[in-house]
């Protein structure tokens, strides 16, 4: 089974849909990013505190190494962490309203 994720960012909300075999779509999560504590690239030192605290972990990334077009970022909330793959354009759109919570390194 081939699984892909699609992200929609609007009004400080991130909607995540799962697409199975390029035909079935299901909404899996809606994140209120005003409650987000931090968003940083996977492996960033900014995430050390969150990685050591445990909590629930959800992987909504594409599952492949980063490319020039897609980068893997972790979104941290109190007690929950989400892994997503985003383009620079998508990240820049989020940074317009949430720049103080998004780290680029």
Language-model features: locations:
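Transmembrane alpha-helices and immediately adjacent membrane-cytoplasm interface residues
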Residues: 1-2, 19
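Short, surface-exposed charged micro-motifs
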Residues: 4-6
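Membrane-cytosol interface motif
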Residues: 8-25
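A short, polar/proline- and glycine-enriched secondary-structure boundary/capping micro-motif
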Residues: 18, 25-30, 94-97
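Short amphipathic beta-strand/extended segments with alternating polar/hydrophobic composition
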Residues: 26-34, 82-88
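Structured surface patches comprising rigid loops and adjacent beta-strands/short helices at the edges
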Residues: 28-49
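Short, surface-exposed secondary-structure junctions/capping segments
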Residues: 42-50, 98-105
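A membrane-cytosol interface segment of integral membrane proteins
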Residues: 55-105
